[in-house]
């Protein structure tokens, strides 16, 4: 689903008529995911000269939920919505700009941190309710979630230490519920993740029969944003699956998911050009996240595509030929951390609210909006963490889910290796006993936060 929000200044409101006010509008768009769909969506904006400020794509099998922020006048952006709705595979487009909403994005920021300033940095991290996710002798990597205003404040306060690198996901948002009103109820299912479907119990599946807004019953297999396919796809590679491409020792095909990090100019049409390179070569984009970089005028694109090492190497060479590309890195075989941001709205009354909050505290999720019939939670982590929380919340009824794509972050390899060695020495653990999330070194895997 694609979603865009309007932001206008007082000066613009006083000098421009209503149809010519400039602002950033957020669309919510649900579509059937095909190889070329991201390129077609970006092309609608590029042909009209609009620069995409933020893009978040939550993929799941053949469906995708888009959240895009662009700037323009209200009249023209209304025309853009109509053009998006005409695309064959677009199911629904919705503008939530004028609705009260919970808006969040995820930012990873790497700063220079001399040991004598560490105490001050840690104090700022605590003030902004951020987390340290990576550390070395001369740098710290900080994870922070919040609205755009909070992101600006974090950057301003940390800039004096020296910002080395910034990675930001696209913005996601959910509508705030009003007291006394009934929430839209879609009952999203965590079982729609194909590699985790087997763990669903019969009782849980029986509870996922839902009704559409028209009152018609809809089985879970018909799906919404995160559908469950009833077809037997065993033995078939699902290239949109989040964990497709992880090679086993006996896998000789060479296919795997490759993570590419690109630094590009922040100008209209760049995303369309970049995704066009993938589309022309038949690459399906498993994951895509776009956000502002640490340097003004530049954006960072992180994408995941399936392929062999050789074919992706040729793809990187083609990307380097683009004028607006400053840097392309394949970080698949490098140590990196991954994070995803999710907003999830649960239908719950006052009697069950305590139970939901207890579950949220276990997963370190935060309540960001509460009404008399819903709770909206914010959660960061990896895919399995998201799925486990959704499974526990399904019996209460899940109204809406908004997700960023998985954001991959290159970490300090020297520190990770030394830390892993310490863990093995002190705890006498074997690498096979450690929880496996994307590997950070040859000895073991990253530990879930």
Curated annotation (Swiss-Prot):
InterPro entries in the cross-refs: Acetalactate_synth_ssu (IPR004789), Acetolactate_synth/TF_NikR_C (IPR027271), Acetolactate_synth_ssu_C (IPR019455), ACT-like_dom_sf (IPR045865), ACT_dom (IPR002912), AHAS_ACT (IPR039557), AHAS_small-like_ACT (IPR054480)
Subcellular location: Plastid, Chloroplast
Superkingdom of the organism of origin: Eukaryota
Any one GO BP annotation for this protein: L-valine biosynthetic process
Molecular function via GO: acetolactate synthase activity; acetolactate synthase regulator activity
Transit peptide: 1-30
Range of residues in the leader sequence: none
GO cellular component: chloroplast; cytosol
Pathway(s) the chain acts in: Amino-acid biosynthesis; L-isoleucine biosynthesis; L-isoleucine from 2-oxobutanoate: step 1/4; Amino-acid biosynthesis; L-valine biosynthesis; L-valine from pyruvate: step 1/4
Entry-linked SUPFAM superfamilies: ACT-like (SSF55021)
Predominant cellular place of this UniProt entry's protein: plastid
Family stated for the protein in its record: Belongs to the acetolactate synthase small subunit family.
Subunit record text: The acetolactate synthase complex contains both large catalytic subunits and small regulatory subunits.
PANTHER family noted in UniProt: ACETOLACTATE SYNTHASE SMALL SUBUNIT (PTHR30239), ACETOLACTATE SYNTHASE SMALL SUBUNIT 1, CHLOROPLASTIC (PTHR30239:SF0)
Free-text function comment from the UniProt entry: Regulatory subunit of acetohydroxy-acid synthase. Probably involved in feedback inhibition by branched-chain amino acids. Not involved in herbicide tolerance.
Protein name per Swiss-Prot or TrEMBL: Acetolactate synthase small subunit 1, chloroplastic
Species whose genome carries this gene: Nicotiana plumbaginifolia (Leadwort-leaved tobacco)
Organism taxonomic ancestry: Eukaryota, Viridiplantae, Streptophyta, Embryophyta, Tracheophyta
């Amino acid at each position: 689903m694609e979603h865009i929000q309007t932001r206008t200044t007082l000066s613009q409101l006083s000098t421009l008529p209503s149809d010519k006010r400039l602002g950033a509008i957020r669309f919510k768009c649900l579509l059937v995911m095909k190889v070329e769909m991201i390129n077609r969506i970006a092309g609608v904006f590029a042909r009209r000269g609009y620069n995409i400020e933020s893009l978040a794509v939550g993929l799941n099998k053949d469906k995708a939920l888009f959240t895009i922020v662009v700037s323009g006048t209200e009249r023209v952006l209304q025309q853009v919505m109509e053009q998006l709705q005409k695309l064959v595979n677009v199911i629904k487009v919705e503008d939530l700009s004028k609705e009260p909403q919970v808006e969040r994005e995820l930012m990873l920021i790497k700063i220079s941190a001399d040991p004598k300033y560490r105490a001050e940095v840690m104090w700022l991290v605590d003030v902004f309710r951020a987390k340290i996710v990576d550390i070395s002798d001369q740098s710290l990597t900080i994870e922070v979630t919040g609205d755009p205003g909070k992101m600006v404040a974090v950057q301003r306060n940390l800039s004096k230490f020296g910002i080395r690198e910034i990675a930001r996901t696209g913005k996601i948002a959910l509508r705030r519920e009003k007291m006394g009103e009934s929430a839209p109820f879609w009952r999203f299912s965590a079982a729609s993740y194909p590699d985790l479907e087997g763990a669903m119990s019969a009782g849980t599946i029986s509870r996922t029969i839902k009704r559409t807004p028209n009152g018609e019953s809809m089985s879970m297999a018909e799906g919404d944003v995160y559908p469950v396919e009833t077809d037997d796809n065993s033995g078939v590679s699902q290239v949109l699956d989040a964990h497709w491409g992880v090679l086993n020792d006996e896998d000789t095909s060479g296919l795997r998911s490759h993570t590419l990090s690109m630094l590009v100019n922040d100008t209209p049409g760049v995303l369309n050009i970049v995704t066009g390179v993938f589309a022309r070569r038949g690459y399906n984009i498993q994951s895509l996240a776009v956000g502002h970089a640490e340097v003004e005028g530049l954006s960072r694109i992180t994408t995941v595509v399936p392929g062999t090492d050789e074919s992706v190497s040729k793809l990187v060479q083609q990307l380097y030929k683009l004028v607006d590309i400053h840097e392309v890195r394949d970080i698949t075989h490098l140590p990196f951390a991954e994070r995803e941001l999710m907003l999830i709205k649960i239908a719950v009354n006052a009697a069950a609210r305590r139970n939901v909050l207890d579950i949220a505290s276990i997963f370190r999720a935060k309540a960001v909006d509460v009404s008399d019939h819903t709770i909206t939670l914010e959660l960061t982590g990896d895919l399995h963490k998201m799925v486990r929380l959704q499974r526990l919340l399904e019996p209460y009824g899940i109204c809406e889910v908004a997700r960023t794509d998985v954001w991959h972050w290159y970490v300090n390899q020297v520190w990770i290796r030394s830390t892993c060695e310490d863990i093995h020495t002190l705890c006498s653990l074997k690498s096979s006993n450690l929880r496996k999330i994307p590997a950070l070194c040859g000895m073991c895997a990253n530990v879930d936060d």
